[in-house]
């Protein structure tokens, strides 16, 4: 039978052997009167619930905003592993609501479930914050604590997700349905507010505050943990005025039992003598009431359309992983503000708040006036296409970033520059092979070659002979180099003559957008340089070369330095994103001690503003896909199945994150190619979904109404009764 066709339930020819009588639910105790807000019809208890939700969402999204960078730079995992664990955590957060709903519906009730799992949530934050302390153990300890903390957080946030909104709805009397609807609007506003504010603030706590000489991940995790403590305390404060309905049974479990019984009963009755039934779910008629079977039939028709949906979430949820990793390799200076890479995620909730009224009141109405039938399924398909375009744009940005990156020497190649620290010009040539024409220009005093020159090696390592001409002197020197490296040949005065030294340079930009610096000291005394309150380095006398140090991007007009008998400061100027600098400390007789600044590797030039189009496209896709998808699903399934639909919707998000995990671990593609892969996969899925939607026959509301059935169990369930609100989950 075509799964898209309407399924009218008919009496079967096979007489049921037995029918299980489902006892009616005992009447609920009357709700005790609750204090109201300023004499209105709004219970005072909802204020505690709304504040709780704001703090909890701040806690979750704030912690998650910095998570990918924590994996990369604190736990020192590679990008693929960091992405995989990030999406494994996200997936777990969307699997655990099923467990939370089952606990609330069948055992503890909503209130106790929220309290107990919030305690688990807080414990997870505490363990996660401890794991981010550099002084607490080594790499293994940090990793173990982090994974335990994240597992508890996933259990806590997922477990309470299906309970909090529904518990708020329980505070209203049935006659105050209008006030309850407005409450849900405020509730969902608190979700978006918590997401928006936390995604902006916690990256600043991480990047703008230093702990133990590093980014302060402990603070970035600790503040969201504190907000979760506040959420728990505020929620518990309202305990005495809450209406706490008892557990009412789990409709999700009932659906699974009905489906399982139908399948098993069908296989038990495979004989050709037994009459066939119109629908495979009709085989549950021996045990389950007719209305429940009709509702499950309607549910399965919608769930069939859910099969392609995880691919969309696979793209959408990469904003916090792959797109953040892309942002760290871009120039984040906007002129009026310097962004942290993980702050770009704030665009999503911000644009959601802008796009929802724009689409509802402008775009959809204009399309309707043009006479175009823009159905829900078509909106979802367009949302998928917009997400495809977003990843195509992300791939183009990635390609441009790679083009701006410094070229790398290949096998049997090195890159070489010459720095002349002598008091007069020097001419340098390479002796004895095809490279002798590369360095033909004289290099003036305190100048360098305009760019790195490529030298070809005969083997993986080679000794090069250099001919130096200085005044009337002609000198020969020899230096050894290794393939695939960058070098600086430093010419310096040596009495009345000159000498040279070969210094190995950094090969590439830092992966985290930090600035790399090192120093050459031409003074006759050691110099101690304080780059920050907790970062200093010593440079040996007489052309000593320091190790590389990474520092935050910014202006450094007065870096404190000292020798054994003198304190002084150096103006290093702007140290920009991703650049590598060499500073030569010299004593100029006219201007005193100075630092000659040499940019070995240029800064990131690609502005982070180029990520705005991909964020705008994917958020527009989210508004068209997610909001419309929920509205469509709820219009096509009976009211008794709303909580089951929400469970299935959350599962599609969980599966989408698993797809990213698998691709990140096993694709082996460069980043721009991976973006193209996701874009193409979703395009194929969009085509399949469009075909499914073309043959889908929408169900009218009256078609889902069946005759009253005394065997229908009165089960409402405690999953969130999602209204068609525009929000994050």
From Swiss-Prot:
<feature type="glycosylation site" description="N-linked (GlcNAc...) asparagine">
    <location>
        <position position="567"/>
    </location>
</feature>
<dbReference type="InterPro" id="IPR036259">
    <property type="entry name" value="MFS_trans_sf"/>
</dbReference>
<dbReference type="GO" id="GO:0030670">
    <property type="term" value="C:phagocytic vesicle membrane"/>
</dbReference>
<keyword id="KW-0472">Membrane</keyword>
<comment type="function">
    <text>Proton-coupled amino-acid transporter that transports oligopeptides of 2 to 4 amino acids with a preference for dipeptides. Transports neutral and anionic dipeptides with a proton to peptide stoichiometry of 2:1 or 3:1. In kidney, involved in the absorption of circulating di- and tripeptides from the glomerular filtrate. Can also transport beta-lactam antibiotics, such as the aminocephalosporin cefadroxil, and other antiviral and anticancer drugs. Transports the dipeptide-like aminopeptidase inhibitor bestatin. Also able to transport carnosine.</text>
</comment>
<feature type="transmembrane region" description="Helical">
    <location>
        <begin position="140"/>
        <end position="160"/>
    </location>
</feature>
<dbReference type="GO" id="GO:0070293">
    <property type="term" value="P:renal absorption"/>
</dbReference>
<dbReference type="GO" id="GO:0015031">
    <property type="term" value="P:protein transport"/>
</dbReference>
<feature type="transmembrane region" description="Helical">
    <location>
        <begin position="612"/>
        <end position="632"/>
    </location>
</feature>
<dbReference type="GO" id="GO:0042908">
    <property type="term" value="P:xenobiotic transport"/>
</dbReference>
<keyword id="KW-1133">Transmembrane helix</keyword>
<feature type="topological domain" description="Extracellular">
    <location>
        <begin position="317"/>
        <end position="343"/>
    </location>
</feature>
<feature type="region of interest" description="Extracellular domain (ECD)">
    <location>
        <begin position="402"/>
        <end position="611"/>
    </location>
</feature>
<keyword id="KW-0391">Immunity</keyword>
<dbReference type="Pfam" id="PF00854">
    <property type="entry name" value="PTR2"/>
</dbReference>
<feature type="topological domain" description="Cytoplasmic">
    <location>
        <begin position="365"/>
        <end position="380"/>
    </location>
</feature>
<dbReference type="GO" id="GO:0140367">
    <property type="term" value="P:antibacterial innate immune response"/>
</dbReference>
<dbReference type="GO" id="GO:0140207">
    <property type="term" value="P:tripeptide import across plasma membrane"/>
</dbReference>
<feature type="glycosylation site" description="N-linked (GlcNAc...) asparagine">
    <location>
        <position position="472"/>
    </location>
</feature>
<feature type="modified residue" description="Phosphoserine">
    <location>
        <position position="9"/>
    </location>
</feature>
<dbReference type="GO" id="GO:0071916">
    <property type="term" value="F:dipeptide transmembrane transporter activity"/>
</dbReference>
<keyword id="KW-0325">Glycoprotein</keyword>
<feature type="topological domain" description="Cytoplasmic">
    <location>
        <begin position="696"/>
        <end position="729"/>
    </location>
</feature>
<feature type="topological domain" description="Extracellular">
    <location>
        <begin position="402"/>
        <end position="611"/>
    </location>
</feature>
<feature type="topological domain" description="Extracellular">
    <location>
        <begin position="205"/>
        <end position="217"/>
    </location>
</feature>
<dbReference type="GO" id="GO:1990961">
    <property type="term" value="P:xenobiotic detoxification by transmembrane export across the plasma membrane"/>
</dbReference>
<keyword id="KW-0571">Peptide transport</keyword>
<feature type="glycosylation site" description="N-linked (GlcNAc...) asparagine">
    <location>
        <position position="435"/>
    </location>
</feature>
<keyword id="KW-1003">Cell membrane</keyword>
<comment type="subunit">
    <text>Interacts (via extracellular domain region) with trypsin.</text>
</comment>
<dbReference type="GO" id="GO:0015835">
    <property type="term" value="P:peptidoglycan transport"/>
</dbReference>
<dbReference type="GO" id="GO:0005886">
    <property type="term" value="C:plasma membrane"/>
</dbReference>
<dbReference type="InterPro" id="IPR000109">
    <property type="entry name" value="POT_fam"/>
</dbReference>
<keyword id="KW-0812">Transmembrane</keyword>
<dbReference type="GO" id="GO:0070424">
    <property type="term" value="P:regulation of nucleotide-binding domain, leucine rich repeat containing receptor signaling pathway"/>
</dbReference>
<dbReference type="InterPro" id="IPR018456">
    <property type="entry name" value="PTR2_symporter_CS"/>
</dbReference>
<feature type="glycosylation site" description="N-linked (GlcNAc...) asparagine">
    <location>
        <position position="587"/>
    </location>
</feature>
<keyword id="KW-0597">Phosphoprotein</keyword>
<keyword id="KW-0399">Innate immunity</keyword>
<keyword id="KW-0968">Cytoplasmic vesicle</keyword>
<feature type="glycosylation site" description="N-linked (GlcNAc...) asparagine">
    <location>
        <position position="528"/>
    </location>
</feature>
<dbReference type="GO" id="GO:0016324">
    <property type="term" value="C:apical plasma membrane"/>
</dbReference>
